Amino acid sequence: MSKEVRVRYAPSPTGHLHIGNARTALFNYLYAKHFDGKFIIRTEDTDDKRNVEGGEESQLKYLKWLGLQWDEGADIGGEYGPYRQTERLDIYQEYLNELFAKNLAYKCYMTEDELEAEREEQRQNGQVPKYSGAHRDLTPEQIEQFEAEGRQPSIRFRVPENTTYTFNDLVRGKITFESSDFGDWVIVKKNGIPTYNFAVAIDDHLMKISDVLRGEEHISNTPKQMMIFDAFGWEAPRYGHMTLILNEERKKLSKRDEHILQFIEQYRNLGYLPEAMFNFISLLGWSPVGEEEMFTQAQLIEIFDPERLSTSAAIFDQHKLKWMNNEYIKAADLDRVIDLALPHLIKAGKLSEDMDDETRQWAENVISLYREQLRYGAEIVELTELFFQKEISYDEEAKEVLNGEQVPEVLQVFTDKLIHLESFDKDAIKAQFKATQKETGHRGKKLFMPIRVATTGQMHGPELPFAIELLGRDIILNRLDKLLKEMGA
């Protein structure tokens, strides 16, 4: 790259970190680090009606949780601050004054009702609604009259005539807009706060932003920002617009979509690992060379190539996310898996927060049984249900297993073996399977399936000898005895 790469993620503190925003931040982070550049966080907080208390802190908290580290930002400072737009209002005023001096900005006193009436008339005439320029050249007398009426003006940018705005999008290639597509647009609202496109262009220039990677919904904002760059004689950054994220039904991912969790906080609370989320999100609209999908952050930084950003919409595949998180759980230290899962058993009321050491060790052993199956921490509650239920029931498939003619003999012999065990541990229990097989002559599914169903109520499950040990001698013998009595054995 001919100049230092400087990219920014610019969240608005309007709520929690959304999947789409997390992807924008992550791609900018990978882009910056791949090219040994700088990753900047700039808070765009001028819309006080939409700002949420704690919104900025929440965004930064979950960016950090994902593993992103920034080089400049409101929380750590930097050479090109301040990094909150509400702290830069004097800067915007300075450049607004310059636009007035160049006759590139003017006051517009039209009310919202007047503007809507104008748009409606254009629609009725088959035109695309845009500002007509009605207040483009007001006389001093007209301005005085509007001021006397108490009207508050907005300030509009005077869009140049017969001008073409072209940029080579990093994702989509050449994109062109004509100035005639736009009416004079508002750069400062009636409350004196600069609009998004005006403030962003100034910030991007002053912060020396080299590249802007963002969602495709910003494509139409790009020519407006280019107008501001042109007005001051500045070089615009390179732009790249990522495709939409769709749900599994190929519809745009919406915050109102109840079938997909939308916020990073929700995934953390459910027991997803941050490195799994980082890996998964990195593949939403970008693909590496080859078939491999599992990458560390360091590997992604090394291989990230903006030319491989997809021109097709990304699909948020929940099954793939669960698969990927499971892969990370299987590779994690057991202590970390326990820390991930145990709080969910406590939250569900299965265990007490002040459990004794013996109970905690038992719970850790139970969790270890499901390490290979666990897709996210909260799933441990469902997976381990058999260890917390007092009574077990049998579905039709299980009943069919128990109806086998060999079952009473298998269960009776196995029960007798367990009764006489001195040490009720998995190794000793495992040996009783072999002893039961030797005594009854039954092997394979005819031996193991009846014992599994009788002791756990399930057709499938974790390592059976260890599960039997953890369920405990009393529970297991009671279950076997009850079932044998029902069979008349």
Swiss-Prot record:
A motif ('KMSKS' region) lies at residues 252-256. Keywords: Aminoacyl-tRNA synthetase, ATP-binding, Cytoplasm, Ligase, Nucleotide-binding, Protein biosynthesis. Pfam families: Anticodon_2, tRNA-synt_1c. It is an enzyme of class 6 (ligase). One of its GO terms (molecular function) is zinc ion binding. Disulfide bonds: none annotated. The keyword Glycoprotein does not apply. A motif ('HIGH' region) lies at residues 11-21. It is found in: Cytoplasm. The keyword Aminoacyl-tRNA synthetase applies. It catalyses: tRNA(Glu) + L-glutamate + ATP = L-glutamyl-tRNA(Glu) + AMP + diphosphate. InterPro entries: aa-tRNA-synth_I_cd-bd, aa-tRNA-synth_I_codon-bd_sub2, aa-tRNA-synth_I_CS, aa_tRNA-synth_I_cd-bd_sf, Glu-tRNA-ligase_bac/mito, Glu/Gln-tRNA-synth, Glu/Gln-tRNA-synth_Ib_cat-dom, GluQ/Sye. Its main location: cytoplasm. ATP binds at K255. NCBIfam families: gltX_bact. Catalyzes the attachment of glutamate to tRNA(Glu) in a two-step reaction: glutamate is first activated by ATP to form Glu-AMP and then transferred to the acceptor end of tRNA(Glu). Belongs to the class-I aminoacyl-tRNA synthetase family. Glutamate--tRNA ligase type 1 subfamily. Monomer. PANTHER family: GLUTAMATE--TRNA LIGASE (PTHR43311), GLUTAMATE--TRNA LIGASE, MITOCHONDRIAL-RELATED (PTHR43311:SF2). HAMAP family: Glu_tRNA_synth_type1 (MF_00022). This is Glutamate--tRNA ligase.
